Amino acid sequence: MAETKKETLAEKVKRLSRGLRGSLVDSLKDEHTGSLRSDDQLLLKFHGMYQQDDRDRRDERALKKLERLYSFMIRLRIPGGMIGPVHWEALHNVAGENSTGTIKITTRQTVQLHGILKSKIKPTIKAFDSVFLDSIAACGDVNRNVTCTSNPAASPLHKEVFGYAGEISRSLLPKTRAYYEIWLDENLLAEKEEPEDPLYKDVYLPRKFKIAIAIPPYNDVDLFTNDIGLIAIIENGQLLGFNVAVGGGLGTTHGNPDTYPRVGTVFGFIPKKDILRVVYEIVTVQRDFGNREDRKLSRLKYTLDRLGVEFYKREVEKRAGISFESAKDFQFTTRSDDFGWKQDAAGNWHYTVFVENGRVCDEHGYNLKTALLEVSKTRRATFRFTCNQNLILSDIFPKDKDLIESILVKFGVHRKTAEVSPIRKNSIACVALNTCSLALAEAQRYLPSLIDKIEPILSKHGLSEEPISIRMTGCPNGCARPYISEIGLVGTSYGKYNLHVGADAEGYRLNKKYKEDLDESAILQELDGLFGKFSKDRKGKESFGDYINRIGILK
C-alpha cells in the first residue's frame, strides 16, 4: 500500500480557508488582543500583510506581564514598481497617519509600511483602494510582485516590456474575492458558491513564487535569483520575445545542508505572443510537483533539481503546447542603478534618487520624505521603485525638469545622491530587527554605520571609487539577495555574520561563504586583507568579485 503523505499545518490551513477567508473577520473584531489567531496569521500573508511585534520591547513588556506589542506590515502589489504622484501623496499620508511614518522600498520594487495596529488595517487598505492600490498576493504562497527593469531610459522598448509585468501579474492573481469582502466590505452573496480558482485551486502554491523581467544589458532586477526570469530579446528595434530562466532562489536555513541558493537555468527562447501561456504553465508544474511536505524544500529550485531540468522543461512544453527554441544571445553588464538625470529616446527625463536601504523618511536633518511629497504635489513626475531599493522620479517633460531639479536641490537630495560613495550606492539591507520575526541580527539599522567604517579601508587601498556590491540580511532567508553580491553578510546571531564573497558584478554567479560568525572587528579585518590583495593583484579593471573568484581562496 502506498504511503499516505502527512498534510502539514500550512497546507491544511490553506485548504480549509474558504478562499483565504479563514476566521479573519472574527480575528479583527477581537479587541482583547492586538494579535490575530494563529491560522489567520498565515492567511493574512495572501492579503499582503504580516503580523509582527516590536522585538526591542519584548523583555520590557514581559516584565510587565503584557502581551507583545503587535503590529502589522502591509506590502503593496505594484507590478514593475511604478505609481503616479497621486498614489505617492496618498502613500505619504497613510504612512504618517497609520504606520511608523517610514516608507520602505523593498528589494522587489514595491513599498511596505510597518507598525500598523490591528484597528488601522482596514482604514489603511481602504485608503489605498481609494487611489486604486492594493496588497493582494504581495505575500503568501502565490506569485509575488512581478519586477521589471526600472529605468525607462534603458530602452526605447521599455514601455512595451514593462507592460508584461502587469499582464503577468494579472494573469496569476488569485480569483477569490476574500480581499474585497474582508477589507473593503464587499457584500458576500451567501447563496452563490465561489468557483474554484483554476490556477491555485484550494491549496495555492507550495511556497512563494517570484518573477522578474530584465532588458539587457541591465540586470537591476537580479534576474537569475527568481523562480522565473524573462530576458527581453530585442533585435532591429523590435521585441521578439524572451529567454526564459527557471529555478532561481536564494533562501537557505542555517545548519540545513539540504537548503541552498541557486541561480536560474535558461530553458530557451519563447516568442512574445506565447510568453503568458508559458509562464502560467511553469507555475502549474510547480503547483503540482512542488514539495508540500517540507516548506524549507518547497521552492521551485528544489523541484527543478529533484525532477531534473529536462523533465520540468518537457512538462511545461506539453502543458503549453509550445517548444522552447534555443536561447538567443544576450549580455548583462551591470546591476547598479544609474543615478542622477537620464534622458530617454522620447526626450523625457528620469532622475534616480539614492535611498539608503530603501528607507524614505525625514531624519538627521535630511528631509527626503518631505522632498518627495513636494515633487508629488507638482504632478509632474511619476515614481518608480528599483530592486536596489532606490527611487526614480520619471517621465518628466523637458519643460518640467528645472522645477523638479529645484526641489531636489532645495532639500539636499541632489547633493546626497551625487556625494554618496559607490559602495554605499551598491548596498542593500533587509528590514530585520526590530520587526521581522525571523531576524537573528541587525541589517538596515546597522549596515549604514558598518559602511562608514568600510569606506576608510577602501580609501586606504585606493579603492574608494570601486562599485563593490555589499548586502546584509538578518537571517539566511536571503531577502536582500546577499548570496549573489560581491560582499554578502548573513546574520547568524546578534552582532555576528557569515561573510560571503566572490559573486560577479553582473549577477550571473553566486558568492561563497568565506568566514563564519564574524563580529564587526573581524569583518573589517577580513575585508581589509582582501581589499589590500585586490588593490595590488587585480588584473586591469577586474571586479572585486571576479578577483576573489580567480585567486582560489573559496572552497
UniProtKB/Swiss-Prot annotation:
Assembly, per entry: Alpha(8)-beta(8). The alpha component is a flavoprotein, the beta component is a hemoprotein.
Pfam families to which the protein is assigned, alphabetical: NIR_SIR, NIR_SIR_ferr
Family: Belongs to the nitrite and sulfite reductase 4Fe-4S domain family.
Lineage: Bacteria, Pseudomonadati, Spirochaetota, Spirochaetia, Leptospirales
Residues binding [4Fe-4S] cluster: C430, C436, C475, C479
Keyword Oxidoreductase among UniProt keywords: yes
Residues binding siroheme: C479
Keyword terms of this UniProt record: 4Fe-4S, Amino-acid biosynthesis, Cysteine biosynthesis, Heme, Iron, Iron-sulfur, Metal-binding, NADP, Oxidoreductase
Pathway membership, UniProt: Sulfur metabolism; hydrogen sulfide biosynthesis; hydrogen sulfide from sulfite (NADPH route): step 1/1
Signal peptide positions on this chain: none
Reactions catalysed: hydrogen sulfide + 3 NADP(+) + 3 H2O = sulfite + 3 NADPH + 4 H(+)
Organism superkingdom: Bacteria
Named cofactor requirement(s): siroheme; [4Fe-4S] cluster
Protein name: Sulfite reductase [NADPH] hemoprotein beta-component
Top enzyme category: oxidoreductase
Bound cofactor: record note: Binds 1 siroheme per subunit.
